[in-house]
Amino acid sequence: MAGGRPHLKRSFSIIPCFVFVESVLLGIVILLAYRLEFTDTFPVHTQGFFCYDSTYAKPYPGPEAASRVPPALVYALVTAGPTLTILLGELARAFFPAPPSAVPVIGESTIVSGACCRFSPPVRRLVRFLGVYSFGLFTTTIFANAGQVVTGNPTPHFLSVCRPNYTALGCLPPSPDRPGPDRFVTDQGACAGSPSLVAAARRAFPCKDAALCAYAVTYTAMYVTLVFRVKGSRLVKPSLCLALLCPAFLVGVVRVAEYRNHWSDVLAGFLTGAAIATFLVTCVVHNFQSRPPSGRRLSPWEDLGQAPTMDSPLEKNPRSAGRIRHRHGSPHPSRRTAPAVAT
């Protein structure tokens, strides 16, 4: 800002781009996530299993709504938590600006579109960060559901809901002479249980709840670390970030403890969500920082000119400089002869 007045920038493409490009892309992502989650447009891959495999013989824990961390609670947390954090952070940044002695922050311009629409920097930042977060949230859902549909990896309680007829399948029970499973079943009609429960039990890898929680906490923790400014304390921001990471970890533990997912499913979900959040924060919203008002980027040579420099120790110590000059034959400054003056 110059003279306390904000920079004004006129743009006639911001509203059409938001309506016809970004909103359409977000709608496509939401529609694809809905198709993968609630319809059978993409059938789940039928993966075979070994007879009497103890890996998939855990008891049925009940419907998802009966879990200690039901999906409704997970969806509420991953939606409300980051939204409130970003909203409070942007409001604090707008009403309590950093003091002049703090690290300088590049200011944004106020966009004027047409004769009626004016978008201030706080509004632009809020819409940008929350819009990108929403896009990433549905993208994480797509990645998790696509992985479940393609792999068809059974849950730990798969055999409890599948209820296969081992006699009809020709499976023999384990014995001292044959401790392990003896046959791999690939028949699609091997399960006699409820088709809906069997289909849900084939969607274990990766864990969608773990992916959503990891995405939400990674995005929010990076926002807290990169945007919040706490003066005089080094432990406030790490404490907030660890407090955000704790619920996501507990969600993964509960999924494993209730025999709804394997540890590998939860870890894959954590990696998926964290990777998507890191990519969006780093490459899309540029670490939640504003871009310079001018569109021209510095060349590498100009950028080197702004790099921090280090003074030579010889310039700080004139005695050492004098010794080096004397050693190489240069006369000491005090012993130089004055130039002759013509008479």
Swiss-Prot record:
Name used for this protein in its record: Phospholipid phosphatase-related protein type 2
Primary subcellular site in the record, as a coarse category:
membrane
Per its UniProt entry, which superkingdom is the organism in?
Eukaryota
Pfam assignment, any one: PAP2
GO BP term (any one): phospholipid metabolic process
Q: Which GO terms describe its cellular component?
A: plasma membrane
The molecular function terms of the Gene Ontology recorded here are:
phosphatidate phosphatase activity
- Ranges that cross the membrane: 12-32, 69-89, 129-149, 210-230, 239-259, 266-286
Q: How does it sit in the membrane?
A: Multi-pass membrane protein
Gene name linked to the record: PLPPR2
Region: Disordered, residue numbers: 290-343
What the record says about family reads: Belongs to the PA-phosphatase related phosphoesterase family.
SMART domains associated with the record: acidPPc
